[in-house]
Amino acid sequence: MIDFDGLSNAFSGQTVLCVGDLMLDEFVYGEISRISPEAPAPVIAVQRSETNVGGAGNVARNIAALGARCIFVGLAGEDDAGARLRDTLSRERLIEPLLISDPARSTTRKVRFVSEHFSTHMLRADWETLAPASGEVEQALIDAILPQLPCADIVLLSDYAKGVLTTRVIRSVIDGARRLGKRVIVDPKSADFGIYRGATLLTPNSKEFTDATGRRADDQASLAKAARDLMRIAECEALLVTQSERGMTLVPGEGEVIHVPAHTVKVRDVTGAGDTVVATLAVSLAAGADWEAALRTASAAAAVAVAKSGTAIVTLAELRRNILPPASLAAEEKIARSAGDLDQHLTAWREQGLRIGFTNGCFDILHPGHVKVLTGARAACDRLIVGLNSDASVKRLKGEGRPIQNERARAEVLAALEAVDLVAIFEEDTPLNLIGRIQPNVLVKGGDYSLEQVVGQELVTARGGEVILIDILQGFSTTSLVKRAGGA
């Protein structure tokens, strides 16, 4: 069993130096509706499209999504795709992008046409320059990488064979890292593993492993033998073969072979899942995980990634929910830690077409009246967010001596209720700004308010939402409970 809380708490203190091939991933979703009258070719009725940072850039984004810092070195052309990638990466808080410009190179761009209903890929169009970086660009890459090695806890090379990781760049990075005692993970593309000589860990997939060995490995014994032959060539400490639905197998230089089965999930899209695996491995190993813990963490992350569409990242919260059994998930999982955390929940729920409800209050001493309103609110929606006044806000509204319980305690009590899906603490006297951010489908308050008195009702109804008043339970109020307790 992984001590995931202990491991993940160390993620934010790690820095990963990631070097590799950057690309722009575009997804065009739609359905084939007819055959073109111009030629015997299908016509795709486009419904939506999205753009993501791909290749080694997706590795960097997955590192950052786990809370670690990433120094990313890559290559981009002086074109529209390159400009879009630079802009996107510059806005990533935990990524420091060091992108070398190459005017002679087209930025790698992949456009995938995907069935919206079936999630199957129908066609892919690529724009790319496969030639290795020129000598001048090679030197610029090396000059950008070497000064960053002392800052890194671990180094990750993400090779997509698009020109960045030339033999000279690879050797400069691995040799430099070894002189400083830094571990190096390589996600290889070349069938010649000798060019990665001296790396700590190589992570080929099944096809890359077969290409490098020249033979199939149909069982664990033959895989381990072939892996050790490769390890002698690469002079690496371990080799990990990722095998899609068959899981992943690590062959260490010393010790037993470790096999981790794949999680049983409905696969939506495998694009970028390998990026998620190597990113999670790098962060986990940097944080002190042993081989098995790192593998199990990476396998859990891959299961989250393949259940998403497009080039996906996996957040620390998503990973935690997949690793820990539901019974062990603390109420804190239902407390929004930041505006960004709130937005992630909202995005996920809206993608699923869920009806979002909102109610708010101080909830200083939870009583049956509160429970009635919360239960009624949850019955009117698919996901209920409770806005909770902060300690400072309660004090301004209720006076000295309040709140009785601090905001953290109040949030944990609310989060423990089955009716509550998320608690969001706000500092203002009213939740108007929070309602504007959430844009709920349903706004709920106790029936001691009139419709006109409900804060935010104009915002909700203007968007076609609904405002619901729930009859209060007479004889219960926090103020009266406090007075009665004080006189006892």
From Swiss-Prot:
The active site is at D275. InterPro entries: Bifunc_HldE (IPR023030), Carboh/pur_kinase_PfkB_CS (IPR002173), Cyt_trans-like (IPR004821), PfkB_dom (IPR011611), RfaE_dom_I (IPR011913), RfaE_dom_II (IPR011914), Ribokinase-like (IPR029056), Rossmann-like_a/b/a_fold (IPR014729). Gene3D superfamilies: 3.40.1190.20, HUPs. One of its GO terms (cellular component) is cytosol. Pathway: Nucleotide-sugar biosynthesis; ADP-L-glycero-beta-D-manno-heptose biosynthesis; ADP-L-glycero-beta-D-manno-heptose from D-glycero-beta-D-manno-heptose 7-phosphate: step 1/4; Nucleotide-sugar biosynthesis; ADP-L-glycero-beta-D-manno-heptose biosynthesis; ADP-L-glycero-beta-D-manno-heptose from D-glycero-beta-D-manno-heptose 7-phosphate: step 3/4. In the N-terminal section; belongs to the carbohydrate kinase PfkB family. This is Bifunctional protein HldE. It comes from Nitrobacter winogradskyi (strain ATCC 25391 / DSM 10237 / CIP 104748 / NCIMB 11846 / Nb-255).
